[in-house]
Amino acid sequence: MMWRRISAVLCVVALFAVFTATASAVKYVALGDSYSSGTGTRTFYEPTCQRSVYAYPYLLHNAHPEWTFVNATCAGAKTGDVLNTQVTSVTSDTTWVTYTIGGNDAGFSSVITECAQPSWASNCEGAINTAQSYITNTLPGRLDLVNNAIKSRAPSAKVIVLDYPRLLNGTDCNALTFFSGSEMTRLNQTADMLKNVESAAATRAGANFVFRDVIPPFIGHAVCDGGGGSSTEWINGLSNPTGESYHPKVTGHASGYYPVVKGVTG
């Protein structure tokens, strides 16, 4: 009789252990472009894709080291890269997914490069018009493909969709750039357009998709806020190497992106 009681207790303990392990098994997959990989932080543990320990995905990983973490982010990524390469990291046991995507599809870095030149040497307005047309007419369908691919691979995963900050504050403090006030206004309006399109796509994707806007926390911390290169800036201005330009700094991830993500995941 005693042996049976001991066996029963051991079985209960074993079942509890299995249940606890299953319940606590969390997998987090980070997808997306340079705003998720950490370009702009200037320190990369994986240089090809410019993945940084200071980027918000790695900060979330540090907060939950018990989670399985897969970082599939890569600088320069477009929606096609997510669909063809990155999304394979999302499996049926995935709990959380985060991403920023769409800026490269719209050619936003090329737009910034064009607009940074003197007006007589560039066609900033034309570049912005082309980007905005893409955002309005083509990007929604591309985002739907990304979201559907994630859903098909991990129907139960919670997906946090993030946008991009407004980069400019209306003042050009960099000696080698030539943004006009109207150009900066339109560039920031383009970030707002991206936000609206990404938010709508997340809504279409269903209840497991949550859109979070990073524009509010970055207000007051754009390029040239506090003067070029100041600690008030959370975004790099024109930088060396130039690929780091107009991307969130370490503080941009720690104080801008990460709190927004952490507010959802806990």
Language model features with spans:
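Serine-esterase "nucleophile elbow" of acetyl-processing enzymes
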Residues: S24-T73, T88, Q117-S119
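Short amphipathic alpha-helices and their capping/turn segments at secondary-structure boundaries
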Residues: A17-V29, V82-Y99, D144-S156, V261-T265
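Structural recognition of the beta-strand scaffold that forms the well-ordered cores
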Residues: K27-G38, T68-T73, T95-T100, D105-G107, ...
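Catalytic His-Asp segment of secreted/periplasmic serine-dependent ester chemistry enzymes
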Residues: P165-G266
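Secretory targeting and sorting signals
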Residues: M1-A25
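Oxyanion-hole/transition-state-stabilizing segment in secreted/luminal serine hydrolases
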Residues: T39, D81-I135, R166-L168
